[in-house]
Amino acid sequence: MAHISTRKFIKWGDEPAGENTDTLVLTTAGKHFVDIRIYLPTSPDEPSIPSLTPLPISRLEWGFAGTASPTPAVYSSLPGRETEIEKPSHTVWTHWVDNKTTDEVQDEGDMYPQPNRETMEYGAMENPDTGKVEKYQECWVDLEIAKVDGEEEFRSWVLRTEDEEAGVRGVLARVGVFIQGVLRRGEDISVGRWMWDAERGWQPVVEIGKALVPRGVFSQEEFVLGQRLVASDGLKWVCVESFSWK
């Protein structure tokens, strides 16, 4: 099923745990994901999040999107120990578009459910502060999925755009009242996060980049699988997933 998660903290190796980003991950029912990590402001002069004006690219720690491949956990079969994990669930995330690289890289981690809708993730990936692959621990908090006003069902969808010759790849995903997007046009990177407002419709939480994802692409809230549309900037998008549930 679809889910929304925000990061509570990350811990690298023996360093203390901390969090210097506003990180939100949308994962759709079909296991497409969009992961956007925005540096928190370090001075009163820097805009906070949500921001009504676009932020500089320097505020983007990481923005990537692709598909997740989870393997379920294996629990003990011994009587009285059925809740003990013998082998944790494991997820591999394949990056189809990434602000850091044009390669389809992967990262992976072991997941351990915790109380209060939290999950601990253990794995290894590149530390942005050192440039080296290091072991990490991340604490994720699952957010409750909400409905857009007037909709009777929960909804998720995914739009993609690609132009190999122009170096274009982009993903827009909606889960409930959140939409996130990552767009690469050559060397230009754009990311966006929007949230539904009952009075004003889809409103920006954060937008970064020269080639901003046009909000007009998702002016309609429902898409049909295979549906094609052209944005105001000429990019051609196609719906690769559309799902609703009660």
Regions found by a protein language model. Give the residues of each.
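Lipid interaction determinants
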Residues: 1-63, 73-246
